[in-house]
């Protein structure tokens, strides 16, 4: 089985340092939106808060493609669902560590439960 492509280390560092990732899911032209992003084990993960049927998460799940903005660069991405409990736990920990301000804690708790946790998606270079 081939291993998944990974983002270059400088991209991973930039994503780890940013609080809000700009993402455009799918192939249809539309605006970029801001979401939280974490890095765990050198891999890049996102979760959906809203889970709207027409939102970025469901579009990304249907098409498994999109773009992210990292600094001044726009990068094509692919996406895959995460089901491994050990990976989900590492992503839980990454969210808790990165978004630890008093105003963020309640959202982190929500992202660590139920459907939001099940929305964990790994972003990969296309």
Task: Tell me the role of every PLM-derived stretch.
Residues 12-13, 36, 111-113:
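Short secondary-structure boundary/capping segments
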Residues 18-51, 57-58, 66:
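Short beta-strand segments
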Residues 1-22:
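Extreme N-terminal tail/first-helix region
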Residues 30, 51-125:
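Short, structured beta-strand-loop surface elements
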Residues 3, 17, 40-41, 71, ...:
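General secondary-structure edge motif
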Residues 7-10, 31-33, 108-109:
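A generic local structural motif
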Residues 41, 125-126:
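A short, structured loop/turn motif at beta-sheet edges
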């Amino acid at each position: 089985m081939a291993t998944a492509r990974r983002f270059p280390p400088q991209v991973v560092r930039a994503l780890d340092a940013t609080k809000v990732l700009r993402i455009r899911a799918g192939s249809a032209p539309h605006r970029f939106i801001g979401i939280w992003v974490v890095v765990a084990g050198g891999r890049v993960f996102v979760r959906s808060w809203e889970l709207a049927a027409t939102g970025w998460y469901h579009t990304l799940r249907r098409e498994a493609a999109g773009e992210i903005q990292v600094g001044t660069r726009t990068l094509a991405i692919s996406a895959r669902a995460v089901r491994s409990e050990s990976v989900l736990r590492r992503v839980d920990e990454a969210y808790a560590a990165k978004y630890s301000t008093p105003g963020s804690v309640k959202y982190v708790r929500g992202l660590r439960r139920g459907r939001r946790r099940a929305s964990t998606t790994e972003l990969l270079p296309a």
